[in-house]
A protein has these predicted regions:
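Catalytic cores of transferase enzymes with a strong primary signal for eukaryotic protein kinases
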Residues: 46, 100-104, 148-151, 157-159, ...
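Substrate-binding cleft of extracellular glycoside hydrolase catalytic domains
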Residues: 22-149
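Bacterial N-terminal signal peptides
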Residues: 7-16
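Catalytic domains of cell-wall/extracellular-matrix polysaccharide-remodeling enzymes
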Residues: 113-196
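Flexible, glycine-rich phosphate/dinucleotide-binding loops
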Residues: 58, 87, 160-162, 191, ...
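Functionally critical loop-and-helix segments that line ligand-binding/catalytic clefts
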Residues: 22-29, 36, 169-274
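Positively charged n-region of N-terminal signal peptides that target proteins for export
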Residues: 1-7
Length: 274
């Protein structure tokens, strides 16, 4: 009986998710060593790719530029994330934006804009320690200051719930982070605990081959990637495209603003090619 009830619950979950969501975003990093077939990925229904750009300590993902070019040529939307650590968050944000801008300006064919994300998870495999909540706040505020847009915040559902409700986290800090859009990981079920956000925007339901959901509706592979990191957007495909364009950063906008006398981006540095 327990198994039967569990199966019914999973079926209901699938029906609920399919009714309002699109399984159309993939994320990648330098740990994905294969030559990614982005054309095949698009043919399988993927709309956007979010790729690691920078990680501790102040390093750059060597695959980022070439994959941005290949994904753009395949007609995919493009995003970038930074894996945060416990060092100076403003310097991290500047390093991240300079990397993204340099690769954007350095391509003949470039994406319309770049969706920006802070990877705010426990750091147990890079130097620099784990980013604190106050540092995450400083990071996203620096991104907003320089781009005019808040980035997304990525993390596991349980960790975000624990960290953001911990001692020393102020209501103001939660409020600032809630200005960002939420990308949350849960490989077992649809995320439910999203406070201070009203709901999730992207749900990473599988990574490294881990997924407890029905494979028919929640595939773990895509194109030539057998153990992909796949994500569901809370909305239709058209809604995803609108969301992406509304939140994406165009590096040329920052550069143009800074070139004008009295530009309205205080403290920003020109994101020149590196």
């Amino acid at each position: 009986m327990k198994i039967f009830v569990t199966r019914i619950s999973l079926v209901l979950l699938v029906l609920q998710v399919c009714a309002f969501a699109s399984n159309s975003v993939v994320n990648l990093s330098h740990y994905d060593l294969m030559r990614v077939d982005f054309v095949r990925m698009k043919n399988e229904g993927v709309v956007g790719v979010i790729h690691e750009a920078t990680y501790p300590r102040f390093d750059r993902d060597s695959y980022y530029g070439s994959r941005q070019d290949a994904a753009t040529r395949a007609g995919l939307l493009w995003g970038a994330y930074h894996f945060g650590d416990a060092t100076d968050p403003v310097r991290q944000a500047d390093h991240f934006l300079e990397m993204v801008a340099s690769r954007w300006h350095g391509q003949i064919l470039r994406p319309d804009g770049v969706l920006l994300v802070l990877d705010f998870e426990k750091n147990d495999h890079y130097p620099g320690g784990t980013m604190r909540v106050d540092q995450a706040v400083a990071f996203v505020e620096r991104i907003r200051q320089r781009t005019g847009k808040y980035p997304g915040v990525y993390g596991g559902e349980n960790r975000l719930r624990t960290v953001l409700n911990g001692r020393g986290v102020s209501p103001l800090q939660r409020q600032i982070l809630a200005n960002c859009w939420l990308w949350v990981a849960n490989y077992h079920s649809e995320p439910r605990h999203t406070a201070p956000w009203d709901h999730w925007h992207l749900w990473q339901y599988t990574g490294d081959g881990k997924c407890d959901l029905p494979r028919a509706r929640f595939p773990k592979s895509v194109a030539n990637i057998r153990k992909a990191e796949r994500n569901i957007f809370r909305g239709s495909l058209a809604g995803l495209e609108d969301f992406w364009r509304a939140h994406a950063w165009k590096p040329a906008v920052e550069a143009a603003a800074q070139e004008k006398p009295g530009g309205n981006m205080p403290g920003a540095r020109v994101a020149a090619d590196r």
